[in-house]
Each structure stands twice: as structure tokens, then as C-alpha cells.
């Protein structure tokens, strides 16, 4: 269930169907839906050049402790990949200095209304196909292992790979399509 928009919070504009969009690599939403959606991936480097996250890494880690949030912790061990489901205690969340872990939180847009604004850029997708905003945070060498999703995924990466922290000057790539 979506949270009501907070007073003073402005909705960003959803893209017009026939207007080229920078984050789609100059394609219009109609062209993207016709030529790429559920057909082939599209990689757009620097898709959101002015992107400033409204949700911090600390916010995401705090959500992992919230029993309303669907959260997972993936660790790579010598024996392979280990998956743990939240909510987690503060002690269960790895420190920034440890490596080979990733935390994923689903439905962030329903728990933090400011995160819902980011989804406006994707509102040209049929509402039945636009589910939620999932945010992940990873330590150095973190990941979730090879996998196939049973749903469509838009990946937006606003931090440096493997660093787990935002680094100024990096433009996030955007990968869209079947994943």
C-alpha cells in the first residue's frame, strides 16, 4: 500500500510517451516499450547524471531491522552463498569493513514516501508490471550470485562497484529490460 504524499513533497514528472528521455538513452518511452521491453536489455551509462539519492545507506540498513520491510542478507562464504531473511538485529548486519555481503530491501517506496518519487520516471510502464523499488547495499566484493529473476528489472547503480559507498563524480548506469 502506498503512503500518502507528504505535504510540500512534489511529484516528479512522468515521461511523455513520444518525448525522448535521457535515461532511456534518447529513446522515447514508446520506442523503449516497442523495441526493448521484455525483448532485450538496454544499457545506458550516466542515465541519471544529476541523481541524488533521497534514501541513505544508513536508511536502508535501518529498514533491514524493521519488521514491515522484506529484507534479505546474502553472504558469500567458503561453502558458497548463504541467504538470510530479515528483519535483522543491528548485530546481524555486517560492518562496512567486512566483505562479500549484500543487503536487499524490497518495497522501499511503500515505507519511505520520498523513495516513491523515483518510480515516477518509470510510470510509463503498465501499472500491473511496476511493482516496487528494491534497494541493495553491498560491502566490498558483495553480490548476490548468478541468478535469474522471474520478473522485469530496472537496475540503477548510483555507487561504485564493490565499494559499498557513494563516490562523487560517478554517473550511475541504468540497465533495463529482461534480467
Roles of regions detected by a PLM:
Residues 38-40:
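Non-catalytic, conserved peripheral segments adjacent to functional cores
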Residues 2-4, 11-35, 50-55, 61-179:
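Active-site region of the double-stranded beta-helix
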Amino acid at each position: 500500500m502506498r503512503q500518502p504524499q507528504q505535504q510540500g513533497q512534489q511529484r516528479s514528472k512522468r515521461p511523455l510517451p513520444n518525448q525522448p528521455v535521457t535515461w532511456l538513452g534518447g529513446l522515447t518511452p514508446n520506442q523503449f516499450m516497442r523495441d526493448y521491453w521484455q525483448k532485450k536489455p538496454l544499457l545506458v551509462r550516466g542515465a541519471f547524471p544529476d541523481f541524488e539519492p533521497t534514501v541513505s545507506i544508513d536508511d536502508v540498513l535501518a529498514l533491514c531491522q524493521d519488521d514491515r520491510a522484506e529484507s534479505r542478507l546474502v553472504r558469500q562464504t567458503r561453502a558458497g552463498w548463504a541467504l538470510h531473511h530479515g528483519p535483522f538485529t543491528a548485530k546481524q548486519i555486517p560492518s562496512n569493513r567486512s566483505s562479500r555481503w549484500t543487503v536487499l530491501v524490497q518495497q522501499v517506496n511503500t515505507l519511505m514516501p520520498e523513495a516513491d518519487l523515483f518510480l515516477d520516471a518509470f510510470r510509463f510502464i503498465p501499472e500491473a508490471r511496476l511493482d516496487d523499488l528494491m534497494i541493495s547495499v553491498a560491502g566490498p566484493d558483495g553480490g548476490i550470485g548468478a541468478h535469474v529473476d522471474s520478473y522485469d528489472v530496472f537496475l540503477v547503480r548510483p555507487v561504485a562497484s564493490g565499494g559499498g559507498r557513494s563516490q562523487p563524480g560517478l554517473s550511475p548506469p541504468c540497465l533495463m529490460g529482461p534480467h
